[in-house]
Amino acid sequence: VAEESKFDYIIGNPPFIGSKIMTQSQRDSVVREFDHVQGSGVLDYVTAWYIKAAKYIQGTRTKVAFVSTNSIVQGEQTSILWGQMLHKYNIKIHFAHRTFKWSNEAKGNAAVYCVIIGFASFDTPNKSIFEYEDIKGEAHEIKAKNINPYLVDAKDLLIEKKSNPICNVPKMSFGNMPLDGGHLLLTDEEKKEFLKREPDAKKFIKPLISAFEFLNGEKRWCLWLINAEPSELKRLPEVLKRVELVKKFRLASVAPSTQKFSTSPTLFRDRNQPSTYILVPSTTSENRKYIPVGFFGKNDIANNSCHIVPNGTLFHFGILTSEMHMAWVRSICGRLESRFRYSKDIVYNNFPWPQDLPKQKIQGVEKLAQQVLKVRERYPDSSLADLYDPLTMPTDLVHAHQELDKFVDSCYRHLPFSSEAKRMEFLFELYEKYTADLFTKEKVKRTKKKV
């Protein structure tokens, strides 16, 4: 390795290899480079280059700039990588190009969503963020006081997984995981054929709502046997055949955690089914301005490809489908390829909701949220995927969302937000305040317990 003093700059385009497609050798290299830090097994290959460079430039005036996939500034990877970069190696980001789309000719012109991050082991007063209004277009430069790991002009905060929301809102959970080998699930055609053979099973067949069905208006069904009496099941031989197949599937698994559920083959592995809930798809296209969310009841079984907010209200719906929440999603949410991969522990539980609102503000959000739902109902033949496609989104739905956005913004502050960057600066400040308040409350609780 050359002496550090010989280099003014290190510039590179490290390999774009995601954590799920790395070889074992590459994964071992990453974990080793991170000195076996907890969670390092989920990191992309490029993160090892960042740590390697951070170690190499310690005590020097060398500046580094890497082109990387944007996964390192979103989702669970961010706090793991930048926790080390900031706190162990005292790295400061000097400039950053926020997400842009880059066509990789070496991979058949495949689109890659990238960032460029310039950093050093010393600070500078001259920092710049390059923002892309159009991710396929040109950037415009914004001067910044500080650039945090999410490439926002805000303090160096790290959004880590939390098991509970930082605000007083319903706790989000996953939908219901079948773990059944497909034997408790039915397509629309399979349901019709099944009921021809066993009409008495009708009461146990419920709509199954996965992210795909929800967004595309498709139908799927499941056997929901949670309240089935043994005597009833004995009279349903076709149902019992499927239950037997579930038992065999679970017993055949190499995972002990799956095998133990063979003792309850009539049931889904995970069962989270409140009487009413808001459904949020776990994965959705990044091209949509808003993540479509919806209301469902106890007879609509949410699949584990969705998150649910039990007993969510129109107010919760309005905030979740607002531009304010979407700005948080775009900056904090992890990705599956380029699609949003919503996380309850990182995105929802850390989201700073507007607090201490007067009754008229809450009612205002509810009224405008209801209007969004009413406009959707005008298009019964269009799926949510159609309604929220940027090219086909109806103008009245666009208008309904814009009115909701403006009102939700006013729940946070009187002045409008001039850009997404300004929204995120505000949300990070609010996040810092809320989490500081939580820390103080927890400290008081612990002190009282000691007394």
What are these regions (language model features)?
Residues 84-92, 240, 245-251, 311, ...:
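A short, contiguous, amphipathic alpha-helix enriched in charged residues
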